[in-house]
Amino acid sequence: MTLKLGILGIDHGHIFGMLSHMQQQGCTCDMYWTDGLAVTEEKFNQVFPQVQKMQDRSRILEDPAIHMILISAIPADRAALAIEAMEAGKDVMVDKPGCTTLDQLAAIKATQKRTGRIWSVNFSERFEVRAVTKAAEIGA
């Protein structure tokens, strides 16, 4: 089974790594939504021309073929989008920070428990930054 992804928010550059690494694992993605015009949007459209922008995020959330949502919206919006995605039956991988308040975290936990969906936070710096990976190789 191929895992199909949708994207909500491309406001932070981590979306490039999030999506490309998922594609390297065999996932597909052909739709994204972002609020307004993200600073990353021009480059995103160049790097991922097959991923088309939707004007309404419900097209992504209501698509039964989409299994998982990647979220790299502005930090204050990530929790609400993750909750909306889990309530729509999707698993979620959100850019860090996954939320910005303890109230948001409590709401995410409650939604995860109620829906049984996966909520995960992408953390890649220790695996991708050359200086860090080199330090690990030499035992630092």
Residue ranges: model-predicted function:
Residues 29, 66-69, 140:
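Local beta-strand N-terminus motif with an aromatic residue
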Residues 99-140:
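A contiguous active-site-proximal alpha/beta segment in oxidoreductase catalytic domains
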Residues 6-7, 92-95, 119-122:
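Short catalytic-loop micro-motif centered on adjacent basic/acidic residues
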Residues 1-48:
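N-terminal Rossmann-like dinucleotide-binding module
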